[in-house]
Amino acid sequence: MIIRTLGADDAEAYRALMLEAYEAYPQAFTSSVAERAAMPLSWWQKRLDNPLDRLLGGFHGDELAGIVGLAFEPREKARHKVTLFGMYVTKACQLKGLGRRLVEAALDEARQHPRLKVIQLTVTAGNDAAFALYQRCGFIQYGLEPLAVRVGVDYFDKIHMWRELHDR
C-alpha cells in the first residue's frame, strides 16, 4: 500500500470514499452523507487544495482505500497545534495495518512543520478499535465532550485526545 498527499485530481475518489465513510459510520463524523453528497465536485477539489488542510490517502493498488486529514490552525496563538480529522479505512482494508500507517504518516507530516508542537483529535466514544489505535500511536485522552454528535434521535459523545509531536 502506498500513502501520499491527495491533490485536486483525487477529488472524485476522495468524495466517493468520504461519502462511503459518512454512510457506514454516521456517528463518527460531524457532517452527514446528505450534506456532503449535495456538495459539487469543485467543493471537494478546493478542500484538497486548501493550504490549511493536508489530506493523505492510502492506496491499495490504484484504489483509494483510506484517508486521514490534518487541519492547520490559522490563528497566530494556536498555530502550534494541528488537528487530525476524517480518518477512515474501507472495510476491505481494515485490520491490515492501513489505519496505523495513515496515522503514522500524518504524524510524520506534522513533524515536518517546526512550529507544530501538539496534534489533537476526537474519536466517538464506543469506537474502541480507533481509540486503541490512537493510544498505540501515543495519543492520550484529555476530555470527553458529551452529546457531541446527533444522528437521528441518538447522541454520541466524543473523546478528545492529544499528543506532543516532539520530545521536550
Where does each model-flagged region fall?
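Conserved hydrophobic beta-strand within the GNAT/NAT acetyltransferase core sheet
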Residues: 84-87, 119-123
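Short hydrophobic/aromatic beta-strand or adjacent loop that forms the aromatic wall/cage
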Residues: 53, 156-160
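Acetyl-CoA-dependent GNAT
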Residues: 5-11, 15-16, 20-86, 90-92, ...
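Conserved catalytic-core motifs of GNAT/GCN5-like acyltransferases
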Residues: 120-123, 135, 140-156
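Extreme N-terminal starter segment of soluble prokaryotic enzymes
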Residues: 1-3
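Active-site acidic-Proline motif in GNAT/NAT acetyltransferases
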Residues: 90-92, 96, 125-126
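Conserved GNAT acetyl-CoA-binding A-motif
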Residues: 110-122
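Glycine-rich acetyl-CoA-binding "A-motif" of GNAT/NAT acetyltransferases
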Residues: 63-66, 129, 155
